[in-house]
Regions:
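Short beta-strand segments
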Residues: 18-21, 77-78, 137-139
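Hydrophobic alpha-helical segments, chiefly the membrane-spanning helices
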Residues: 171-175
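Conserved small/polar residues in nucleotide/adenosyl-binding loops
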Residues: 158-163
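Short coil/turn connectors at secondary-structure junctions
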Residues: 12-13, 70-72, 130-133
Length: 175
């Protein structure tokens, strides 16, 4: 007799991708395109895609719209996580989060160390949940985005029900 837990059933999510950059337009957005390819190849749907400047108000405006939309289950952002003067994505996003997933950033840096050694200390990648929507805040490097998707995000999205699903399952049923 086995007490093995059955594998979770895959659920396709609707994911939005936000590129944050002062220098990239649609043609130069390698990281955003890579994330779109990864999520669609994994069986998820692209809900929306946008590019905004490194401006906390522009970032918050788009993100606020997406976390309030019923057609977005998760958001992937790329760019603005470094330590230069214009890198302000974590500061722009943190006030919107209901819960921060601190282990995500920690694990991201551990995995990044294999490729970029101590330069990973300059990354401020993070994740959280806002209005029952997963938010993943990634560097602008396409390699970092691919690694985060392959080793962290795709696994989390596959094995964890979306916060929106968990929220619905806790709601009392109407009689």
């Amino acid at each position: 007799m086995t007490n093995a837990t059955p594998a979770p059933e895959f659920k396709s999510l609707r994911i939005a991708v936000l590129t944050i950059s002062d220098t990239r337009g649609e043609a130069e957005d390698v990281s955003g395109k890579r994330l779109v390819t990864a999520l669609t190849e994994a069986g998820h749907a692209l809900a929306e895609k946008a590019i905004v400047r490194d401006d906390k108000y522009q970032i918050r405006e788009v993100l606020s719209r997406w976390i309030n939309a019923t057609n977005v289950d998760a958001v992937l952002t790329t760019g603005g996580t470094g330590i230069t003067g214009r890198d302000g994505t974590p500061e722009a996003i943190r006030p919107l989060l209901d819960k921060e997933i601190t282990g995500f950033g920690e694990m991201f840096r551990v995995l990044s160390y294999e490729d970029i050694k101590t330069s990973t200390l300059q990354s401020r990648a993070t994740a959280g949940v806002a209005n029952a929507t997963f938010i993943f805040v990634l560097p602008g490097s396409s390699g970092a985005c691919q690694m985060a998707w392959d080793k962290l995000i795709s696994c989390l999205l596959y094995t964890s029900p979306s916060p929106r699903d968990r929220q619905k399952s806790r709601m009392p049923s109407s009689a």
